[in-house]
Amino acid sequence: AHLGVLKAFEEEGLKPGFLSGTSSGGLAAAFYAFGMPLEEIRDLGDKLHWLRVSTLNVPRLGLLNNSELGRFVEKYLGSKKIEESPIPLALVTCDISTGEKVVLKTGSLSQALMATTCIPGVFSPVQEGERMLVDGALVENVPLTVLKEMGASVRVGVSLGSESYRKPENMIQVIINAINIATDQTNLASEGKFDFILKPQLESYG
């Protein structure tokens, strides 16, 4: 969905001046910010599977460790710093030990992407100094406030709200449903505060 919006912008001759993201949107934003063509990003997305880019984690602050995702990112983009992106980029995470929103605009890109996609309970938090970082969707699922701070005059967000939930069949699906419910409530509370929120219809996918 994120890539479809970017493609529509390109077809209209529009190019974002700033990009922000969390979760899968953070991955899409990062690869695009570093200049990867949309078709290549889509192909990478087809190769990416959480259980193939994770390893069993012991001792467990999460069932899995997503360090393999970091290696996946570095394989295709190299050992980049966030601040090196041609399009200014911000990745939103949450410090699970304090509940604080943590916006990453500098530092290791692969480490930041591990953090912003870190589903709490499924993946172990990513250690960043004293902070324990997880998926920023917990605090701002459509991270547009940071774009204003970066200087954007018009902000366009893509919301992948769950809206409908599937009956969970295992522990991981229970955790994901719980997070989706929480982030959907965050989305509702944020509506009306931004310039444009796009809500692609995804019911027929997945």
Descriptions of predicted regions:
Residues 1-22, 30-206:
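Patatin-like phospholipase
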